[in-house]
Amino acid sequence: MSVTESGVLVDVADRLFEAIANSDIVTVKELLSEEVLVWHSGDSRDSAKERAARIIDWFINATTSRRYEVIERQFFDGGFVQQHILHADGRNGTSIHMRVCIVIKVGTAGLITRIDEYFDPAEMAPLLDTSN
């Protein structure tokens, strides 16, 4: 049975974004395979699991609330593509509303093996502002 047919992809997608929205870094780490590679717009290289988890942890700690407005999610055998608007309120009093396209591959063990995330890195700048 393929990953798509087993319903694993729907579960992984829902759990990942729900975990980030709910500040649950433990679940995020559990969903990532040990060999996962993650690339974000603006990155010069892929990140391994530890660095990828640190980036998500930073985002969770830099924000007080996060919400994903899913525009579209399409599944393919072994993964999915999602377009969404990420709404987040920063601890520094700022807010972001970023349009994102993310491609996620899921291995046969039901763990994420690859993430490619496309967005305008400049839209994260308000969260980095410590002058507020």
Task: Give residue ranges: language-model regions.
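Alpha-helix C-capping/helix-to-loop hinge sites
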Residues: L16-A19, V38-W39, A88-D89
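Hydrophobic alpha-helical core bundles mediating ligand binding, dimerization, or RNAP-core interactions
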Residues: A13, I20, L32, A52-F59, ...
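Short glycine-/acidic-enriched loop or helix-start segments at secondary-structure transitions
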Residues: S6, A48, M124
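Alpha-helical structural motif
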Residues: V12, D24, R51-A52, L111
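A beta-strand edge to alpha-helix "cap/lid" segment located at domain peripheries
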Residues: V3, D57-N132
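A solvent-exposed, acidic/Ser-Thr-rich amphipathic alpha-helical stretch
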Residues: I25-K29, S33-F76
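Short N-terminal micro-motifs specific to bacterial/archaeal maturation
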Residues: A19, G42-D46, I115
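Short, low-complexity N-terminal intrinsically disordered segments enriched in polar/charged residues
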Residues: M1-E34, D129-N132
